[in-house]
From Swiss-Prot:
<keyword id="KW-0808">Transferase</keyword>
<keyword id="KW-0418">Kinase</keyword>
<dbReference type="InterPro" id="IPR031322">
    <property type="entry name" value="Shikimate/glucono_kinase"/>
</dbReference>
<feature type="binding site">
    <location>
        <position position="120"/>
    </location>
    <ligand>
        <name>ATP</name>
    </ligand>
</feature>
<dbReference type="Pfam" id="PF01202">
    <property type="entry name" value="SKI"/>
</dbReference>
<dbReference type="InterPro" id="IPR000623">
    <property type="entry name" value="Shikimate_kinase/TSH1"/>
</dbReference>
<keyword id="KW-0057">Aromatic amino acid biosynthesis</keyword>
<dbReference type="GO" id="GO:0009073">
    <property type="term" value="P:aromatic amino acid family biosynthetic process"/>
</dbReference>
<comment type="similarity">
    <text>Belongs to the shikimate kinase family.</text>
</comment>
<feature type="binding site">
    <location>
        <position position="60"/>
    </location>
    <ligand>
        <name>substrate</name>
    </ligand>
</feature>
<keyword id="KW-0479">Metal-binding</keyword>
<comment type="pathway">
    <text>Metabolic intermediate biosynthesis; chorismate biosynthesis; chorismate from D-erythrose 4-phosphate and phosphoenolpyruvate: step 5/7.</text>
</comment>
<keyword id="KW-0963">Cytoplasm</keyword>
<dbReference type="GO" id="GO:0004765">
    <property type="term" value="F:shikimate kinase activity"/>
</dbReference>
<protein>
    <recommendedName>
        <fullName>Shikimate kinase</fullName>
        <ecNumber>2.7.1.71</ecNumber>
    </recommendedName>
</protein>
<keyword id="KW-0028">Amino-acid biosynthesis</keyword>
<dbReference type="InterPro" id="IPR027417">
    <property type="entry name" value="P-loop_NTPase"/>
</dbReference>
Amino acid sequence: MKHHSLIFLTGFSGSGKSTIGPLLANSLGYGFIDLDQEIESKAGKSITKIFAEEGEQTFRNLELETLRQLTGKKELVVSLGGGVLENNDCYRLIRENGTLVYLKSSPRSLARRLCNKTDRPLLKGEHGTRLSREEIELKISTILEKREPRYATADLSVQTDIKRIGSTVEELTRTIIRFVRQAEQARLKQQSDNNREKQ
C-alpha cells in the first residue's frame, strides 16, 4: 500500500521493535531501518564503544544527525532506540515528521525477555555485576516511569505483552492504515474548509 510515509516505533528495549518492525514494514510495503544499527554503520563502531570512547554527547549528536536524514524519506518504518524520545530535538523531529507508535510491555514481561541477554548495560549493576530478574524489573519500572510522559504522546499504542507477534503485526497494520486514512480525510476537510473561507 502506498500511503502516509514515516512510521516511528518506540518502546522499551525488549518490547519487540526489532522483531515487529521488519514484519510491519513488509506488511505495509515499506522499507525498514533500525536507528541504532544505522548509527553504528555511520560511526563504524558499536553504540557501546561510542559511549565508552567518545561519550554520550557524541552519540546523541549522531542520533540527531541520523534522524534528520531519515525524516526526508517516505514509506519507511524506523525502530527507535529506547531513550531517543528523551532528546528534545529528536522528539520534535519525530512528532513533526511521522506517526509515532508505542509498543507497550509491562516491566515483568520486559525483564523476562531481557534477563538472558548479555550485551545490555541495563542488566548490569553499578560495578558491572549482573542483576537478578527482580532487580532488572525494578530498574525497568523506574526508567519507564521517567519515559512514560513521552510514550503517552504516541499517535498509537499497542500492547505487546502476551500476543503472538503475527497477530500484533496484523493489528498494527490495520490500525495504522485506519489512522492514516482518517488523518488524510481530516487534512482534506481542513483544506476544503480553508478554501471555502477564502472565497
